[in-house]
C-alpha cells in the first residue's frame, strides 16, 4: 500500500489581461450605472462614495472617475494617484443639463486637474450652488 499523497488538483494559471486595464472609480448611483456599462472583464471597479483612498485602487493602465459635479476633492485625489503612478486619468461629471467629460490628465504631458480648474474659474465658471448640489446628490 502506497503512502504517497496524490498531487493537488491542477488549477488553471491566472491569465494576463488581454488589453489595457481601466480602474473605474464611481461615486453615486448614476456613476455605478455608467460603470456597469463601460467596464470590461479585466477592468476593476472601486466605489469612491466615501472618498478616494489610493491604496484601495489596484494598479491599472488608466483611471476613470465618474462622479457628481464639482467633486474637487475627488478630482485632486485622482490627480495625486495619477501622478504618483504615472497613469492617465479622466473625469466624467453629470450636471443638470450636461454630461462633462474631461479633462484627460496625462502625467508629464498635460495640465493637472487643479490647473485646469483654476483656468476654468478664471474665465467665469462658477460651481453649482450648494442647494442644487444637495438636490442632485
Model-based region annotation:
Residues 1-137:
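Adenine nucleotide-associated cytosolic modules
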Amino acid at each position: 500500500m502506497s503512502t504517497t499523497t496524490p498531487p493537488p488538483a491542477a488549477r488553471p494559471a491566472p491569465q494576463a489581461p488581454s488589453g489595457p486595464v481601466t480602474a473605474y472609480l464611481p461615486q453615486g448611483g448614476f456613476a455605478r450605472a455608467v460603470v456597469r456599462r463601460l467596464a470590461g472583464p479585466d477592468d476593476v471597479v472601486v466605489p469612491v462614495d466615501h472618498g478616494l483612498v489610493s491604496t484601495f485602487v489596484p494598479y491599472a493602465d488608466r483611471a476613470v472617475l465618474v462622479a457628481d459635479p464639482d467633486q474637487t476633492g475627488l478630482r485632486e485625489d485622482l490627480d495625486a494617484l495619477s501622478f504618483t503612478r504615472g497613469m492617465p486619468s479622466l473625469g466624467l461629471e453629470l450636471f443638470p443639463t450636461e454630461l462633462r467629460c474631461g479633462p484627460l490628465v496625462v502625467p508629464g504631458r498635460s495640465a493637472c486637474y487643479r490647473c485646469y480648474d483654476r483656468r476654468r474659474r478664471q474665465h467665469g465658471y462658477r460651481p453649482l450652488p450648494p442647494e442644487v448640489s444637495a438636490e442632485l446628490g
